[in-house]
Amino acid sequence: MLRTHTCGALRKSDVGSPVTLCGWVDSKRDHGGAVFIDLRDRYGLTQVVIGPPEANEALIKQAGHVPNESVILIRGVVADRLEGKTNAKLETGEIEVRSEHFEILSASETPPFTPGQSDLPGEDLRLKYRFLDLRRKEMQQALIRRSEIIKCMRDYFAEHDFIDVETPILGRSTPEGARDYLVPSRVHPSNFYALPQSPQLYKQILMVAGFDRYVQVAKCFRDEDLRADRQPEFTQLDLEMSFVDSEDIIGLIDGLVAKTAKQVLGKDITLPLPRMTYEEAMRRFGSDAPDLRFGLEIVDVTSVAAKTDFRVFRGTADAGNFVRGINVKDSALKFSRRQIDELTAFVQQDFGAKGLAWFRVEDDGTLWSPIAKNFDEEHLAEIKALMGGEPGDLLMFLADTWEVTCKGLSGLRKRLAVELKLYEDGELNCSWVTEFPMFEKDEEAGRYVAMHHPFTAPLEEDLPLLKESPEKCRAQAYDLVINGSEAGGGTIRIHDSKVQSQVFELLGMDEETARDRFGFLLDALRFGAPPHGGIALGVDRWVMLFAGLENIREVIAFPKTQKAADMMTGAPGEVDADQLNELHLRTVSAKT
């Protein structure tokens, strides 16, 4: 080893010890006859003094000219800092190293930015020079946190007798969800592999094979439009179990959440985690991943709206749509008309709402609003009672379709929670949403699509609905929600080949297509398949949430941009003609 200690290891008890340190020059100061260098590595920072009597003039001069971010090696002796020169902000702040040997291992050019600067450049520049960005303490802490969480996960499932099995990266395209990333085959011209969107089918096959507890930290790929919390390639903790029901899976993951929170954050989580059905989540919060760190529950006032003279409310109710609202407690005087106009524009532009109606609850308990003249006192009193309105409250309403009121009020909840600081930084709220619909209707395609995936089993009591009313059929599905983000999703799987074929048919797949795409699964289900189920936990998102960050790219070492590009390597890039010829491919001009 070139070094005897890291830059964060030395303490007062090491005074007098000879040491060798290696690291990056974080900063340097020339104090006339002596050079002070703050030497940095991922463990911390140590002050190094290059000056007499330990160092000669040539060594001092060399140290004075070393560029910041250069990698150096120093040998010296640990000493107490001078009185009044200690730094309580550093764990090494009571000591310094008096250097008697100084060596530049790799000199640095002037970097476009430095790890310690407070005014960070734009994200594109940071991603282009990711090797510099990863030197920042915040980035290193995020990746260390990631490593801790993955280790915690692996340890937990090892304790529960899970077998870690690697599944293939090169598989077959089964275009049912997001677009696949395709890989051309050189030895099978005109044929393609697909990179896995998940190990779903392989892990089900493992259950049929008798591996009753499977787990894997799996790399997955989806060619979809990106957001701040999505990447084209991502990591998930994937597991499957035989002879279980949803209660077993949920209970197992409850334990993992508690273990991770305690071990990584030092927080206690009360178990079991709260649950609600999909129907309840949409009704109360307008989202299948509700943020429960704050209230602002949605209330349906359609029954009253239908009786009023306010044409917007009554017309909406008469058309079979909904009037729903939220009560922003003690906020009547916190929002000016201009601010309410901004919120109105927000729900219109982002969610397609027609407008935002509002009432202020006055000190005498009456409701005031520019539209209040369209309501008689009886109806205003009913609205206030339904909303739980009290003096000082601000009541906000959307009148629209179920979908628009859900999305609009859910988005409004989140925005208001941020503006009003309705939750604490670092707060962690975990819950389950269960009993999702099996299917949703794709109006453009004129057919059903699976809400989760085509291998999800229906609730036992809803099995007859597969034939009678598929849209009413509920799935044995469960999502883990952390702070309003989906942190994992799982289902109990279909283990009967006849039911699986029936679901394929409902999804518009004829027998030949189903056999072509999923024949191996249908065959496996005919040879003794146990009841089984599982879940996939998004590792990247878990780390983001447990680290209290907003951008998933902050917890991935080498992420892609929102255009799925790698700014550092230049991927994706063109390939030469010889490579294309080997793969029997040619390129065509992109459509504009």
UniProtKB/Swiss-Prot annotation:
GO CC annotations on file: cytoplasm
Binding site for ATP: 222-224, 231, 486, 538-541
Reactions the enzyme catalyzes: tRNA(Asx) + L-aspartate + ATP = L-aspartyl-tRNA(Asx) + AMP + diphosphate
Region (Aspartate): 200-203
Assigned EC number: 6.1.1.23
Keyword Membrane appears in the UniProt entry: no
Top-level taxon in the UniProt lineage: Bacteria
Predominant subcellular localization, coarse grouping: cytoplasm
Spans through the membrane: none
Site for Important for tRNA non-discrimination, residues: 31, 84
InterPro entries membership: Aa-tRNA-synt_II, aa-tRNA-synth_II, aa-tRNA-synth_II/BPL/LPL, Asp-tRNA-ligase_1, Asp-tRNA-ligase_1_N, Asp/Asn-tRNA-synth_IIb, AspRS_core, GAD-like_sf
Annotated L-aspartate binding sites: 176, 222, 452, 493
Subunit structure: Homodimer.
Family: Belongs to the class-II aminoacyl-tRNA synthetase family. Type 1 subfamily.
Free-text function comment from the UniProt entry: Aspartyl-tRNA synthetase with relaxed tRNA specificity since it is able to aspartylate not only its cognate tRNA(Asp) but also tRNA(Asn). Reaction proceeds in two steps: L-aspartate is first activated by ATP to form Asp-AMP and then transferred to the acceptor end of tRNA(Asp/Asn).
Name the record gives this protein: Aspartate--tRNA(Asp/Asn) ligase
